[in-house]
Amino acid sequence: VVWRTRAEGLPGIRFGLKADALDQSISPANILIRRPVNDLPEDSKEPSISSGPEGTRQFEAAISGLKPDTLYYYSVSQNGEALSPPGETGTFRTLPVPGTARDGLFWVVGDSGTGNRMQAEVHTAMRDWLKKEKRTLDGYLHVGDMAYGSGLDSEFQGYFFESYAETLRETVCWPAMGNHEGRHSSGATATGPYYDAYVCPSTAQSGGVASGTEAYYSFDFGKAHFICLNSHDLPRDPGGAMAQWLKADLEKTKADWLVAFWHHPPYTKGSHDSDKEQQLIEMRSMIMPILESGGVDLVLTGHSHIYERSMLMDGAYATPTVSENVILNDGDGNPAGGGAYRKSPGLFPNEGNVQIVTGHGGTTLSREDRPSPVMRSTILEFGSVLLDFKGNTLTSQMLNSEGQIRDTFQIVKEGRVTVQRIAKPWQPPLVAGPRTMPLRSKGSGN
């Protein structure tokens, strides 16, 4: 649990299984305190954050000995006084034991950190959907660019922590660094405001193989394994440290589901073109072969300000991207339409994956006239993605800022599947309508 204040004082945290019975605590001596480096003497060895308002104190409390898959309530304090209003407590749910049969719901958003009305509407639409469906989130994935325009500490505070305060008080966020955060943060040294903002598992605290860095990591949720990569400022070549760790992590996992996420999309024709930009080309040609040999089911990215979703595909490493003989199922994947995509139970090499570009979380949207040839759905609307794991079925839904489900597909793992490549798959038509969507919505004046 991480929090900040602007004054000196004795930090405290209490937690428990009931909101009105926070009967456990951590000694203040065991709470890590970080101060902005500019507030410290030049030769200080004291823990620090790279930047922040003068007088900032960042507190990090690592809580151990908790029960798995259990909801806890917590409250933080200073000098014995609660920092939240009376009656308000935060919550967190611990991860289930890896391999446990456990349903899970995850929210995915990208390119959202603007602090504008569209970001707020996307967030509100998700929370309204949860209330309507009587669901709670098990996790929150952000695929980068959560702090426009330069990933400054002040932008993290205003455009991420304040904008998503309700959700962050009760849900763990698993982040990937975007190019805007990369302007003031470094993946090589794992320093800067991005790395101050999050505490990511570098020593396999949440499953997987220890990466030794917060720049890339993995975690388990029941029978699903999630991998976060740095596509911005670390080497992407197969012999590099990140790719070598990825191979080791894939070899170890015994999960039934494999989800990977990072910022720069291997396939897009939105505000960016994956056939023309180095980071996108290299993630496609160098990283995707490793993931597909490990049986990846779903890849989540952002950067391109649009919603795009592919057909079931495998082996599309060439530049430019073509669809011939890399599409395994060219249907829509919708159980109410052409039917779900099918894969064998467990993780098998090269049985296909779906790519989602979810860069439509709150900044100006745009697209090219012709969609990527591997995409089944291309939508120029603000929104986010909901991932629902239930047994042998993964359901993905794109929820727009007005609360409408605009795209749905499923992957069902049942029976042994024989891979068949389609020589001439369905091709997306030219997209009619506007090529850009500005930062406003119906009825707004900005």
Show where each model-derived region lies:
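Active-site metal-binding loops of divalent metal-dependent hydrolases
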Residues: 109-113, 144-147, 179-180, 231-232, ...
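Extended active-site neighborhood of metal-dependent phosphoesterases/phosphodiesterases
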Residues: 53, 62, 73-93, 131, ...
